[in-house]
Curated annotation (Swiss-Prot):
The lineage of its organism: Eukaryota, Viridiplantae, Streptophyta, Embryophyta, Tracheophyta. This is NAD(P)H-quinone oxidoreductase subunit 2, chloroplastic. GO terms for molecular function: NADH dehydrogenase (ubiquinone) activity; quinone binding. HAMAP family: NDH1_NuoN_1. Its EC number is 7.1.1.-. It catalyses: a plastoquinone + NADH + (n+1) H(+)(in) = a plastoquinol + NAD(+) + n H(+)(out); a plastoquinone + NADPH + (n+1) H(+)(in) = a plastoquinol + NADP(+) + n H(+)(out).
């Protein structure tokens, strides 16, 4: 009899929870419509995978790409709408969050065609790969719109779990296993530190979890200048630092870049930084409003260390992927300048614009690494010598992306850095901008060194890998080269017409 009553109570409680969830989704689902499209795409992928054979592989790519493009379209249709807080305060929809979601979706859309040939050549499981990519994209989008501490913790964990699985996707590769283990351990440690910081914020604000309510709670409890807030600030900075990978929280980055499948590295190198930057701007700017001087100082230290260490160590690297790992550490130092400048002096607008250019520059470079690696099986920088003699398109497109990463005019990277540094200079960050300018010159050196190798025509310098290099027979049907072409165009042409892009970015400020 007791068991029967308990069973009835359990059924009633479950029904209430289900009805509440259905009610929330019914009345708030339109606010996360782009995310719902991705969820539908995930379900469709699983259904097709369970009912079809490997001959239907093209459908998997089509469904994934279509889901991402439809999600981008839904975001664009929602542009300029009034900011809305939904799901009982868990999510906030505004232009600032949506443009970061757009950047994540754009990166994922470009990464799928970049991965097609790699998956076919390495015989990786296609369905799981695409599921992890879409789920990680979903986690990044939820993180961009997160408005409370619980969602800010759960969303990046969704992204991180998929990242761990993707980085260890080539299970027979010892380097991949080592990178995944290191990534998992450091990711778990950083998540623990992040939660520790959240607990201090929660307690100091009197039990509030929404970002704006935390500020009100700190005012009511008079705890906004307490030691607990300082502990929370340091802990959260460390936790977010792992996602952004600035120095000295960069230890996992070179190993994961080198050991993971190259399309996975291309995906993680941008999406993780975009999502973490969106979260960092809101966490630092809202709950830590009264500690702006303290977090500005912390981020300035991280930016200086990242720009100096990242670019100096990149010079010494012999692996192309490790070089890009340290280059990305330097690049995040430039992005942090925009976070520090903030809403004033168009800091956020310049940061968003530079991130848009960084996606195209970085993915274009990784597309070249994927293409060259599949045909030669090497990642060593020296083995690229003389590539221009065998594949002029690949060599020239690589050179343009590298020059744009270095910030040479008139490419997009130059104008992106110029506006970012100018905003920092107007905000009085003279020392930080000076370090950025000097380290940009250093980065040009190692990018030009690679370009010199690509363009060399002397037979004695051409490596056996390039001598035996075979070009793709169907260039128009090569998805890697399609991705690379899009990235090269985006790395060059937008730099000439910056004002419309900056104007759109300025409209995203909250």
């Amino acid at each position: 009899m007791i068991w029967h009553v308990q069973n009835e109570n359990f059924i009633l409680d479950s029904t209430r929870i289900f009805m509440k969830a259905f009610h929330l989704l019914l009345f708030n689902g339109s606010f996360i419509f782009p995310e719902c499209i991705l969820i539908f795409g995930l379900i469709l992928l699983l259904m097709i995978d369970s009912t079809s054979d490997q001959k239907d592989r093209p459908w998997f790519y089509f469904i994934s790409s279509t889901s991402l493009v439809m999600s981008i379209t839904a975001l664009l249709f929602r542009w300029k709408e009034e900011p809305i807080i939904s799901f009982s305060g868990n999510f906030q929809t505004n232009n600032f969050n949506e443009i970061f979601q757009f950047l994540i979706l754009l990166c994922s859309t470009l990464c799928i065609p970049l991965s097609v040939e790699y998956i076919e050549c390495t015989e990786m499981a296609i369905t799981e790969f695409l599921l992890f990519v879409l789920t990680a994209t979903l986690g990044g989008m939820f993180l961009c719109g997160a408005n409370d501490l619980i969602t800010i913790f759960v969303a990046p964990e969704c992204f991180s779990l998929c990242s761990y699985l993707l980085s260890g996707y080539t299970k027979r590769d010892v380097r991949s296993n080592e990178a995944t283990t290191k990534y998992l351990l450091m990711g778990g440690a950083s998540s623990s530190i992040l939660v520790h910081g959240f607990s201090w914020l929660y307690g100091s604000s009197g039990g509030e979890i929404e970002l704006q309510e935390i500020v009100n709670g700190l005012i009511n409890t008079q705890m906004y200048n307490s030691p607990g807030i300082s502990i929370a600030l340091i802990s959260i900075t460390v936790g977010i630092g792992f996602k952004l990978s600035p120095a000295p929280f960069h230890q996992w980055t070179p190993d994961v870049y080198e050991g993971s499948p190259t399309p996975v590295v291309a995906f993680l190198s941008v999406t993780s930084k975009v999502a973490a930057s969106a979260s960092a701007t809101r966490i630092f700017d809202i709950p830590f409003y009264f500690s702006s001087n303290e977090w500005h100082l912390l981020l300035e230290i991280l930016a200086i260390l990242s720009m100096i260490l990242g670019n100096l160590i990149a010079i010494t690297q012999t692996s192309m992927k490790r070089m890009l790992a340290y280059s990305s550490i330097g690049q995040i130092g430039y992005v942090i300048i925009g976070i520090i400048v903030g809403d004033s002096n168009n800091g956020y607008a310049s940061m968003i614009t530079y991130m848009l250019f960084y996606i195209s520059m970085n993915l274009g470079t990784f597309a070249r690494i994927v293409s060259f690696g599949l045909r030669t099986g090497t990642d060593n920088i020296r083995d690229y010598a003389g590539l221009y003699t065998k594949d002029p398109f690949l060599a020239l497109s690589s050179a343009l992306c590298l020059l744009s990463l270095g910030g040479l005019p008139p490419l997009a990277g130059f104008f992106g850095k110029l506006h970012l540094f100018w905003c920092g200079w107007q905000a009085g960050l003279y020392f930080l901008v000076s370090i950025g300018l000097l380290t940009s010159v250093v980065s040009i050196y190692y990018y030009l060194k690679i370009i010199k190798l690509l363009m060399t025509g002397r037979n004695q310098e051409i490596t056996p890998h390039v001598r035996n290099y075979r070009r793709s027979p169907l260039r128009s049907n090569n998805s890697i080269e399609w991705s690379m072409t899009v990235c090269v165009i985006a790395s060059t042409i937008p730099g000439i017409s910056m004002n419309p892009i900056l104007a759109i970015a300025q409209d995203t400020l909250f």
